[in-house]
């Protein structure tokens, strides 16, 4: 059933809200009506924040995390352990691990995992830059913290093979996270323990 609206401007706003993930037209309508009840200045600030987000946010040239400048606050922090890299699938995983307060090293965001079914190969991910970082920086350990899915496991194995010639220690987070789960959805306690109880990758697979 096609919903009719008394205002073209309202319908236009609903159309835009409905493009967001998980937002249907009923929710979009509630959001639009909520904004109508707010002071105009609040709505302007909301809109300006969205525009600034899209136009001015950048990605760290080292780890590919989101940043307000060329280097993110994590990479620029001298108190972080510069010898440890935690490899994650996406930016949300960085936030999830940071919330555990159990990790003080650096990160490397791949931008996804190898998934032939989705047309994503090694060349589509930040793998070459990872290998370059390990080869050029004083990295002693690389922690693989990818989702416990078939694609995540495939990517883990590929990364291990790529990093093996460098001699760096490659570890993987403990299997406290259920198979098939994504890092960002794990609770903080479980995720924190998985990082602390990580094991050498070579001990976790059979060659």
Swiss-Prot record:
Q: Which GO molecular function entries does the Swiss-Prot or TrEMBL record give?
A: DNA binding; zinc ion binding
* UniProt keyword Plastid present: no
PROSITE patterns in UniProt:
RECR, TOPRIM
Q: What range(s) does the Toprim domain occupy?
A: 83-178
Biological process (GO) annotations held by this record are:
DNA recombination; DNA repair
Q: Tell me the superkingdom of the source.
A: Bacteria
Query: In the UniProt record, does the keyword Ubl conjugation occur?
Result: no
Q: What does this protein do?
A: May play a role in DNA repair. It seems to be involved in an RecBC-independent recombinational process of DNA repair. It may act with RecF and RecO.
Q: Which NCBIfam families match?
A: recR
Family affiliation: Belongs to the RecR family.
- Name of the protein: Recombination protein RecR
Output the lineage of the source organism. Answer: Bacteria, Pseudomonadati, Bacteroidota, Bacteroidia, Bacteroidales
By which gene is this protein encoded? recR
